[in-house]
Regions:
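Glycine-rich phosphate-binding loops of nucleotide-dependent enzymes
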Residues: 98
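Generic detector of well-ordered alpha-helical packing
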Residues: 38, 101-102
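Conserved P-loop
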Residues: 2-90
C-alpha cells in the first residue's frame, strides 16, 4: 500500500481528533501506528490507546503549560521528539506515523521547516504520514497529498466554557 502525506490544520477544533480517528481505523485494520505529540503531555486518549498498545505507540514531547515563548527545555523536547518520529518513519515498524502539533512546533521555531521537508522527501513509500496543528507552512502544504483546514464556525469556548476532560483533552 502506498503511503501519503496528510495535513490537518486551521483554527478549528478537531485536528488531533481527526488524526486519532485515522490511528484507530488503521489499528482496526491491523496496521501499526506511531504517534508523536509535540507541545503536549499525556491526556485522556493515552488511557484509551493503552488498549491497543500492540498496534499503537504514543509519545509526548511537551510540558503542561501553554507555550508563548519557547524555552531551551521546549526546544530540547521538540528535537528529541523529531528524532523519535524520524526514527519511527524510517524503522520499517510502522505503517502510519502521526506528528501531532508539528505545525505549531515549527511555527514557534522549536523545529526547522527544512528538516521536516527533507524527512518527508525521503520517507519510505509505504508509510502514511499525518501532520497536525495550526499554521501549516506553505512548503508542507505543497508537499502534502491531502490537506484539510478545520475552520471554526462556532465554539462554546467563546461563552467561557473551559476545556473538558474526555472531550477536549
Amino acid at each position: 500500500m502506498d503511503g501519503y502525506i496528510q495535513i490537518y490544520t486551521g483554527n478549528g477544533k478537531g485536528k488531533t481528533t481527526a488524526a486519532l480517528g485515522v490511528a484507530l481505523r488503521a489499528a482496526g485494520a491491523g496496521l501499526k501506528v506511531f504517534i508523536g505529540q509535540f507541545l503536549k503531555t499525556q491526556s485522556s486518549e493515552h488511557q484509551a490507546l493503552k488498549r491497543f498498545e500492540d498496534l499503537i505507540k504514543i509519545e509526548t514531547y511537551g510540558r503542561p503549560e501553554f507555550i508563548k515563548t519557547p524555552s531551551v527545555e521546549d526546544k530540547n523536547m521538540a528535537k528529541k521528539g523529531f528524532k523519535s518520529c524520524m526514527d519511527s518513519i524510517n524503522s520499517g515498524k510502522y505503517d502510519v506515523v502521526i506528528l501531532d502539533e508539528i505545525n505549531v512546533a515549527i511555527h514557534l521555531g522549536l523545529l526547522n521547516l527544512e528538516q521536516m521537508l527533507v524527512l518527508l522527501k525521503k520517507k519510505p513509500k509505504d508509510v502514511e504520514i499525518i501532520l497536525t496543528g495550526r499554521y501549516a507552512p506553505k512548503g508542507l502544504i505543497e508537499m502534502a497529498d491531502l490537506v484539510t483546514e478545520m475552520h471554526e464556525v462556532k465554539h462554546y469556548y467563546h461563552k467561557g466554557i473551559k476545556a473538558r476532560k474526555g472531550i477536549e483533552f
